Amino acid sequence: MVCRNVSRQQFRAIMIITSLLDTDLYKFSMMQVVLHHFPAAQVEYRYKCRTPGINLRPYLDEIRAEVHELCQLRFTSEELDYLRGLRFIKSDFVDFLGLFHLPERCIFIGEGEQPGEISITVKGPWLHTILFEIPVLAIVNEVYFRNTRRNPDWEEGRKRLQSKMNLVLDDPALADFRVAEYGTRRRFSKVWHEEIVSTMKARMGVHFAGTSNVLLAMRHGVLPLGTMGHEYLQACQALGPRLRDSQVFALEVWAKEYRGDLGIALSDVYGMDAFLRDFDMYFCKLFDGARHDSGDPFVWGERLLEHYRANRADPRAKTLVFSDSLTFPRAIELARQFAGRCKVSFGIGTNLTNDLGHEPLQIVMKMVRCNGQPVAKVSDAPEKTMCDDPAYLAYLRQVFQLPPA
C-alpha cells in the first residue's frame, strides 16, 4: 500500500487500525511476561499531549468511533501463525491471544481540564489493557492530521526520506550502519507508515534492520524488533518485593522468562546512575546490551562501555541501541563515535513516519498506577518524568539516590 494510490477520500475513510498486530513488538514480549508472571496485576494508563496549543476536542467523536472499532478486532489465524513462528513466543501465549480482544469498558475518552485538551484513561487488568497504548496513540495522531492536513505533501515526504537514506547509502564508511523504523505511535498515517517501511526495505538493503511494527514486519518480510518498554519496569515498582530492588527484580523476571533471548535492557526508568548501580556483573554478562531513551547519548554510551569493562564484559560483544528522538545525522554521529568499540543499532521513529514538513504531535500514554499504587518514570530528561503523585515521586528519588527535581 503506497500513498500515491490513495485518494483524499480514501485517506479519510479508511479505518485506522484494522489489525491487532498493528502495534510494536515489545508490547507482545511484555504481555507474555505479564501472562506468565503477573496475570492478576491491575493498572492505569493516562494520555498526555506535550505539544502546546493543540485542540483535539473537535475530533473526540471521531477518536471514540475509531477506538470502538479497535475493540471489535480479533487476531486472525494468519496473524496467530506468524506470532507462533517467532522463536521467543510460547504456544500458551498464542492460545491466549486467540481468545483476546481489547475491552472497551476499560478505556475512557473525554474532555481534558485545559482548553482544547482531551482526556484518555485506560484502567483494568494489565494483561487485557497492555495493547491499548500504541494503536490509541496512532488513532489520535491520524485523526488529528487527516483533519488538519487534508492534502498531505507526499512528494515532500518522499524527498525527505530519500535524502536521509542517501546519507547512509552514499558513504562507504557506513557499511555496517543499521537502522530500524520505530514510528508506529506518532506516524502521520498508516498508509504513509507502510510506504516508509516498503521503501526502506527496497532501497536500503542490509542497512535496514527491520521495524518495531509487527503487522508491517509480517507483510513485508522484515525483522520485527523490540524487547521491553518503560511500563514493564514501572509496574515492577508495585509488583516486586520492595521499591529499591524493583529494577533488579524486573531484569531477573525478564531473564527467567526469556533465558537470554530479547536481551536489551532499558536503562532510563530511574536514570543512568541508578541503572549502573543495579546492572552488575551478572546482568552485564547475561544481557546482550542496553537501550538509550533519554539524556545525552554520547555520554550514556561512554559510561556504559566503561561499566562493561569494569565488570569484565567485553564491550565489543555488546549492543548499544539508541532510540531517543533520533535523526539520521545524529545516528551517523553516534555510529562514528562507537565504531569498532561495540555493536550499535538505531531505532528512528517520528523523524521517519511523521516528517512531511509540519510539526508532529508529542503525545504519550504512560502507566501511572499498578495495583492501586503510584508508579513513575524518572528519566535522564526531566521533561519525560511522568507521575501523578508528587509524594511518591519524591520517595522514589530518595530510594534511588536521585537528585530533587
Curated annotation (Swiss-Prot):
One of its GO terms (molecular function) is nicotinate phosphoribosyltransferase activity. GO terms for cellular component: cytosol. Transiently phosphorylated on a His residue during the reaction cycle. Phosphorylation strongly increases the affinity for substrates and increases the rate of nicotinate D-ribonucleotide production. Dephosphorylation regenerates the low-affinity form of the enzyme, leading to product release. It is an enzyme of class 6 (ligase). It catalyses: nicotinate + 5-phospho-alpha-D-ribose 1-diphosphate + ATP + H2O = nicotinate beta-D-ribonucleotide + ADP + phosphate + diphosphate. The modification Phosphohistidine is found at H230. Pathway: Cofactor biosynthesis; NAD(+) biosynthesis; nicotinate D-ribonucleotide from nicotinate: step 1/1. InterPro entries: N/Namide_PRibTrfase, NAPRTase_N, Nic_PRibTrfase, Nic_PRibTrfase-Fam, Nicotinate_pribotase-like_C. Its EC number is 6.3.4.21. Catalyzes the synthesis of beta-nicotinate D-ribonucleotide from nicotinate and 5-phospho-D-ribose 1-phosphate at the expense of ATP. Belongs to the NAPRTase family. This is Nicotinate phosphoribosyltransferase. It comes from Bordetella bronchiseptica (strain ATCC BAA-588 / NCTC 13252 / RB50). The lineage of its organism: Bacteria, Pseudomonadati, Pseudomonadota, Betaproteobacteria, Burkholderiales. The gene is pncB.
